[in-house]
């Protein structure tokens, strides 16, 4: 039996736009002691989202996105980096990309994985945080909810922001107008500052 307390599967069993802001301030944990507080996320929403890998339906690459919520979807970006996503259950093909973390523990291991990266850039960006946590293709499909896998996400008692800042997603060419990126207000650990947009604050329900 696991002594860990991962978020339960029910937490992920909703629309990615609901789950994404609720993941802010939760903690990504590795079994070797690496820990980072989630500061930036993006929602990807299946067949209604042209920027989602799952937009055109299930493929061998995206099969995990159409399975049970609470699993890890890992993919290669820019031919050089891995990125990690939590699969959601509100509709087929929904997932939340974890874009940035604030390092909390295991920083020596993160530095070893990332080389001479400055502390503030250890985990600010999807590729950087995946490298800092040693994530690769072998982690695709990992169940985040069991507490016995090498990675999980937990609640350490820090509440999600009541009014997270929302804005357009980064590094996509389609559906660029959708404000489905959320960040912790005032965090110094973001992949990129959030531009000021009308209605930039969003409720934690995703409405």
Curated annotation (Swiss-Prot):
Record key words, sorted: DNA damage, DNA repair, Hydrolase
Protein name: Putative 3-methyladenine DNA glycosylase
Classification via InterPro entries: Formyl_transferase-like_C_sf, MPG, MPG_sf
GO molecular function: alkylbase DNA N-glycosylase activity; DNA binding
Cross-referenced Pfam families: Pur_DNA_glyco
Catalytic activity, EC: 3.2.2.-
Family statement: Belongs to the DNA glycosylase MPG family.
Biological-process GO terms, alphabetical: base-excision repair
Hydrolase found in the keyword field: yes
Organism of origin: Xanthomonas campestris pv. campestris (strain 8004)
Cited Gene3D superfamilies: Methylpurine-DNA glycosylase (MPG) (3.10.300.10)
């Amino acid at each position: 039996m696991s002594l860990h307390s991962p978020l339960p599967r029910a937490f992920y069993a909703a629309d990615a736009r609901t789950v994404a802001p609720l993941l802010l301030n939760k903690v990504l944990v590795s079994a070797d002691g690496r820990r980072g507080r989630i500061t930036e996320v993006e929602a990807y929403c299946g067949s209604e989202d042209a920027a989602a890998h799952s937009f055109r339906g299930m493929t061998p690459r995206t099969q995990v996105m159409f399975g049970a919520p609470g699993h890890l979807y890992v993919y290669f970006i820019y031919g050089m980096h891995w990125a990690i996503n939590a699969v959601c259950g509100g509709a087929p093909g929904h997932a939340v990309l974890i874009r940035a973390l604030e390092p909390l523990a295991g920083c020596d291991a993160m530095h070893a994985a990332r080389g001479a990266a400055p502390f503030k850039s250890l985990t600010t960006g999807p590729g950087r945080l995946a490298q800092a946590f040693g994530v690769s293709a072998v982690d695709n499909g990992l169940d985040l909810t069991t507490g016995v896998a090498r990675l999980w996400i937990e609640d350490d008692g820090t509440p999600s922001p009541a009014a997270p800042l929302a804005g357009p997603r980064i590094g996509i060419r389609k559906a660029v107008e959708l404000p489905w990126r959320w960040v912790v207000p005032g965090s110094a650990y973001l992949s990129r500052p959030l531009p000021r947009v009308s209605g930039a604050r969003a409720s934690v329900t995703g409405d």
